[in-house]
Amino acid sequence: MAQFDTEYQRLEASYSDSPPGEEDLLVHVAEGSKSPWHHIENLDLFFSRVYNLHQKNGFTCMLIGEMFELMQFLFVVAFTTFLVSCVDYDILFANKMVNHSLHPTEPVKVTLPDAFLPAQVCSARIQENGSLITILVIAGVFWIHRLIKFIYNICCYWEIHSFYLHALRIPMSALPYCTWQEVQARIVQTQKEHQICIHKRELTELDIYHRILRFQNYMVALVNKSLLPLRFRLPGLGEVVFFTRGLKYNFELILFWGPGSLFLNEWSLKAEYKRGGQRLELAQRLSNRILWIGIANFLLCPLILIWQILYAFFSYAEVLKREPGALGARCWSLYGRCYLRHFNELEHELQSRLNRGYKPASKYMNCFLSPLLTLLAKNGAFFAGSILAVLIALTIYDEDVLAVEHVLTTVTLLGVTVTVCRSFIPDQHMVFCPEQLLRVILAHIHYMPDHWQGNAHRSQTRDEFAQLFQYKAVFILEELLSPIVTPLILIFCLRPRALEIIDFFRNFTVEVVGVGDTCSFAQMDVRQHGHPQWLSGGQTEASVYQQAEDGKTELSLMHFAITNPGWQPPRESTAFLGFLKEQVQRDGAAAGLAQGGLLPENALFTSIQSLQSESEPLSLIANVVAGSSCRGPSLSRDLQGSRHRADVASALRSFSPLQPGAAPQGRVPSTMTGSGVDARTASSGSSVWEGQLQSLVLSEYASTEMSLHALYMHQLHKQQTQAEPERHVWHRRESDESGESAPEEGGEGARAPQPIPRSASYPCATPRPGAPETTALHGGFQRRYGGITDPGTVPRGPSHFSRLPLGGWAEDGQPASRHPEPVPEEGSEDELPPQVHKV
């Protein structure tokens, strides 16, 4: 089992944001005063149902929607069986003559029912087909299971319906016009009246998000740390990403809720996974479980594949007939949705961001049409269109032309060909501006590798972005291939990472009082998971492998603070937000250099400063991007970056009329009303429509504010990276040996122990020759606490890392050892208590 060695260390809880005296609070309520919603045991499921009912626009819409899902499954199975066994295709294709007349010389008119077999013949053909009977039995069992689940869900959601009516006081007719922030604010208030959770006197917005997104946060962290096998290098195709709904379902089945999963229930990780003494045994158990689930997927592959093909055919056949170019459209891939998702971001919040970025993303990808392909498409459209025009003209002259064999088929195929060819012909009025489009995309999706900036016109950037924003046809093809590929990925790619996954859940799980076991990354704690290149320098104590990649901790914290302005962040997060606010003020003040003549004047840049609070919020982003793109080559690259940062800071300051005059120190700037009341959580108006309109407008301002912060933080990150290029690590790609470690050779004296074991997925710092004393202190502390440094005793010095040829990271000038330091099977590690994160 030496191949399972990995380098994770225990991550201790960092802070407590519970009110003084409530760390171990257990609220007691007299028996007679208990409400129906007092002490709900499974709050994860309860809050998830509350959220789902809100997103499905009420009980009636949810009920009808699930009924149609049952009917849809039944229709697909029944209609497919009818087409296979109850249709005489010889009559349908006119290979067999049917005569309804008593006189053979009279003309025959075949009707559609003539091709239907009698019920007795149809039943006999079904009974003779053994494979069809097997498929129908399996489909019937599955449908009955879904029917029972539907009835159970209806009973459960009726309780949620009552909760909305009586506890939250929101009628179902008004629910479609209430934002989630309004519902969430009423849940927080309901906790004070009904004590939904007895372990805390008050619920916070973060508590509710943790309950709803517990497993989703783990998935985002696993993708962020590149622990799931999603990237593959194929001959002739290069590096590809494969992540489908079926593969994601299997990941969640294995890790979260399936039989033998890592979690005891929805809110608690099993006790044995919280300690390191049995890590190898647990990894072997997980590896075996992955193997059996992979074998089960392989056995069920034919049935799943048939269902995928039938469902895709019935779903997209009509769309292709109506819009042949639909498959040429693009959509956000499942990997892109997981990669771009913030910690603690609900599904509708993510969808809203991606919807805003869809049009600029489509325009960006359309900039890369091949000139040769365009030439072929123009000529193909000309030839196909010419033939199509002649056939249409003949049909208009005499409609009997359609009665000629294959004429209608030819017309249809030619129409599809013309439509497809036109999709490859660019708009003659389109302007090629990939850098500007990529910056607009960044404003909405918030995440982007550094090497994309300045290289938006390169095909490599386009290919990497296509992994996030793929063709609809590629999405359908991947879903069709998923039943075949998923068992192979589980058996041959996921199993070797069993120990890394076990260590990940042990080291990055904290127990939050009143919430349960959550992913520590979801705490958005810049001290434990911040990155020094993302404005967290001096505020983070995280080692390299404890840092979240791509600035996800910092951007997630900013997004959550803007989305939930009533949330009180912990001390370290408050300091980070306060520092960022001060930096925005300084850079915004520096934007006045344009009026002083020190920098070239720009009309678009000047228009930003004249924007008022009632202006269209999205115009701020357009002005910032356009102003930064129109300066020309007269400015140096560094000066352009500084001016762009000043533009964004000036745009952020334009939100000041919406902010209250006296905001708490460290609070993030929020879109608020002039009276200081957060209108995103409590809309008011003379009617439901006025309140809904006000909520939507303020939501747009909040989204624009976050977009500007994303641009600003990326610009700061870029400048800090250029200042210390040797320290920057972005998007650490997996190697062929990721997840595997070589077996140990020799004894303890064969090599010098490393402070942090190295792996193929995470870089680590090794002792530098120039600082032996500091390294000794730092290494000794890291060996015990996984790289967390005491800020009061051990200063953090800059580290220099280089990529190893076969994966992994080592410090410049130091030899890379292939043997990580072993984690003891028994002993002191097993004596450590489970982590308790008091919130």
Swiss-Prot record:
Q: Which residues cross the membrane?
A: 62-84, 129-154, 372-397, 407-424
Give the sites modified to N-acetylalanine.
A2
Q: Which residues lie within the membrane without crossing it?
A: 291-301, 320-328, 471-480, 484-492
Q: Does the keyword Metal-binding apply?
A: no
Q: What does this protein do?
A: Phospholipid scramblase involved in autophagy by mediating autophagosomal membrane expansion. Cycles between the preautophagosomal structure/phagophore assembly site (PAS) and the cytoplasmic vesicle pool and supplies membrane for the growing autophagosome. Lipid scramblase activity plays a key role in preautophagosomal structure/phagophore assembly by distributing the phospholipids that arrive through ATG2 (ATG2A or ATG2B) from the cytoplasmic to the luminal leaflet of the bilayer, thereby driving autophagosomal membrane expansion.
**UniProt modified residues of type Phosphoserine:** S14, S16, S18, S656, S735, S738, S741, S828
Q: Where is the composition biased (Basic and acidic residues)?
A: 724-736
Q: Which Gene Ontology cellular component terms are annotated?
A: autophagosome; cytoplasm; endoplasmic reticulum membrane; endosome; Golgi membrane; late endosome; late endosome membrane; mitochondrial membrane
Q: Write out the topological domains of type Cytoplasmic.
A: 2-61, 155-290, 302-319, 329-371, 425-470, 481-483, 493-839
Q: Can you tell me which family this protein belongs to?
A: Belongs to the ATG9 family.
What ranges does the Lumenal topological domain annotation cover?
A: 85-128, 398-406
Q: Which reaction does it catalyse?
A: a 1,2-diacyl-sn-glycero-3-phosphocholine(in) = a 1,2-diacyl-sn-glycero-3-phosphocholine(out); a 1,2-diacyl-sn-glycero-3-phospho-L-serine(in) = a 1,2-diacyl-sn-glycero-3-phospho-L-serine(out); a 1,2-diacyl-sn-glycero-3-phosphoethanolamine(in) = a 1,2-diacyl-sn-glycero-3-phosphoethanolamine(out)
**How does the record describe the protein's post-translational processing?**
Ufmylated in a DDRGK1 dependent manner.
Q: What is known of its domains?
A: Forms a homotrimer with a solvated central pore, which is connected laterally to the cytosol through the cavity within each protomer. Acts as a lipid scramblase that uses its central pore to function: the central pore opens laterally to accommodate lipid headgroups, thereby enabling lipid flipping and redistribution of lipids added to the outer leaflet of ATG9A-containing vesicles, thereby enabling growth into autophagosomes. The tyrosine-based sorting signal motif, also named YXX-psi motif, promotes interaction with the AP-4 complex.
Give the gene symbol: Atg9a
What the record says about disrupting the gene is: Lethality; mice die within one day after birth caused by impaired autophagy. Mice also show aberrant activation of the innate immune response. Fetal mice display significantly retarded growth. Conditional deletion in brain causes axon-specific degeneration: mice were born normally, but half of them die within one week, and none live beyond 4 weeks of age. Defects are caused by impaired autophagy in neurons, leading to progressive degeneration in the axons and their terminals, but not in neuronal cell bodies.
Chain positions carrying an annotated carbohydrate: N99
Q: Where is the composition biased (Acidic residues)?
A: 737-747, 823-832
Q: What is this protein called?
A: Autophagy-related protein 9A
